[in-house]
Design a protein with these regions (language model features):
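Gly/serine-rich nucleotide phosphate-binding loop at the start of the catalytic core
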Residues: 1-68
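Short, charged/polar micro-motifs that form catalytic or ligand-binding hotspots
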Residues: 31-34, 45, 121, 160, ...
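Short, conserved catalytic/metal-binding motifs centered on acidic residues
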Residues: 44, 95-109, 134, 190-200, ...
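Electropositive, glycine- and tryptophan-enriched low-complexity nucleic-acid-binding patches
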Residues: 56-58, 121-186
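Active-site-proximal, Lys/Arg-enriched surface segment
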Residues: 61-142
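Short helix-terminating capping/connector loops at secondary-structure junctions
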Residues: 91-94, 183-189
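A short acidic (Asp/Glu
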Residues: 109-112, 201-208
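Short, structured coil segments at secondary-structure junctions
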Residues: 211-212
């Protein structure tokens, strides 16, 4: 079993980040790994002994750090598993690589929360944040890729952003995704994209076909 100090040191060595930000980043990641009723900045401060303002400034001013580190770690992990690509599900499926696309809705944490929307979530309506998770599966190992954030129309107006629908964002993501950065040279026909019926969109299908991939919906 790995003790706390070893865990911290291991995580510390994986992060490509300015030295002065590493302490805040590390404590925030550790805080997100524990099970608590509410992952708030105040709770993160209580857990770490740092000031709430340190976490607030870190999240507000360094959003690119998380994206960059996730990209680097995903590529590093993928390259460890890709030298010998095996068929998925221990050889029971014809493909060797799978990309999973699935949306997640996080319930709002308070009445006054930015970028929340009322979503139809199958069994009723949910008010919260939405983003789209993208996961790569190689040799039955799950590797998270950068998720796709969704911004509401009101949030886009307030922050001078161009509003895009969730499906339009998925199309853009697929167009820009270069699998070769993760698994090197490969046969696109060995890649399957798995998504739920909410992504049964002609533009998404065309984006996947353009990459020579295969789309599978329930």
């Amino acid at each position: 079993m790995m003790n706390f100090t070893k865990l911290k040191n291991r995580m510390h060595n994986q992060l490509v980040i300015d030295k002065r930000l590493k302490v805040v980043c590390l404590w925030y990641l550790l805080f997100l790994m524990i099970s608590v009723r509410k992952h708030s900045l105040r709770a993160a401060a209580d857990f770490s002994g740092l000031a709430t303002s340190q976490f607030s400034r870190f999240l507000k001013n360094h959003t690119d750090v998380a994206v960059y580190n996730l990209n680097q770690l995903s590529k590093k992990q993928a390259k460890q598993f890709c030298p010998v690509l095996k068929s998925l599900a221990k050889g029971q499926l014809p493909w060797k690589v799978a990309i999973l696309i699935d949306s997640t809705i996080e319930h709002r944490s308070s009445l006054h929360t930015d970028n929340v929307k009322r979503f139809n979530h199958g069994k009723g309506f949910v008010i919260g944040h939405q983003w789209t998770n993208v996961v790569l599966i190689i040799n039955d190992k799950l590797i998270p890729l950068t998720p796709i954030p969704f911004y509401t129309k009101s949030y886009c107006r307030e922050h001078n952003l161009k509003y895009q629908t969730e499906n339009a964002l998925v199309v853009q993501y697929i167009d820009q995704l270069n699998l070769q950065d993760y698994i090197g040279a490969h046969d696109p026909k060995q890649v399957v994209v798995l998504a739920d019926s909410g992504y049964d969109d002609r533009k998404i299908q065309k984006a996947i076909i353009k990459k020579n991939g295969i789309l599978s919906l329930p």
